Amino acid sequence: MIQLPSLTHIGGDFNVYGNLSIDEGSVPNLEVIKGDFILAHSGFRNLPSKLNFIGGRVIISPSDDPGLIKQIREADAAGKILGGVHFCD
């Protein structure tokens, strides 16, 4: 598994599409993604616990973990996702 414990901010897109070797435990201190967060078909089952801002879109698959989809919808409703939620397939 990829481990990036010091990563707190991403100044652009965070694309982990199809990458099963990265999950929410890989980026435990991630707070901000200024661009798109593309996490469809990845190892994510939850949003990173400290993530509080996504400046772009969240792109996910309807076949991804239902709990993750619920968390994303809640974050969107709370205004944490500026670009909205988009399904890729």
Could you say what each language-model-derived stretch is?
Residues 1-3, 9-46, 50-69, 76-89:
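Concave beta-strand-loop units of leucine-rich repeat
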